[in-house]
Amino acid sequence: MPHKIFPQYEESIYIDANINILSEYLFNLVKQSDKVFMQPRHFKNMCIYKEYEDVLNAMLDDKKLILDELEFIKEAGMPKNYGFGENNILYRKHNDEKIIKINEDWWEMVSNYAKRDQLSFAYLLWKNKINIKDSTFENSRLQIENFYVFGHKKGRK
């Protein structure tokens, strides 16, 4: 968790190993923003329920864990079409109390439910009143002038 690893810093950017940064775009976005969190919009889904469906159909995780998590977020009242981000780039003001809570709860959810971290993260943003649609930028796969995204290996969960 970045607030534990980097307490001396105010903010951090997590970037998946399969992404190369090709420009100053991301850094300029961060400099110009007052948000405590930002991530790219998901390349395909804008609804967490559609992503659950896709993850189940592609068998990307344990079916029981996915269904248990899906039931949990439904019971909590997670709305449809709230927005959905991709966790391949995460900007966080990681010492912010709300972000600390999200990160700690995220660890608990990934430890106890599906390992597909985008699912639980989107729920936790909603639960902690971070508007996904206001906190996302164009997907990195679509910004070929700013990012190069390598494909994941087939059969990887």
Language-model-detected regions and their locations in the chain:
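Glycosyltransferase catalytic domains, chiefly GT-A lineage
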Residues: 1-157
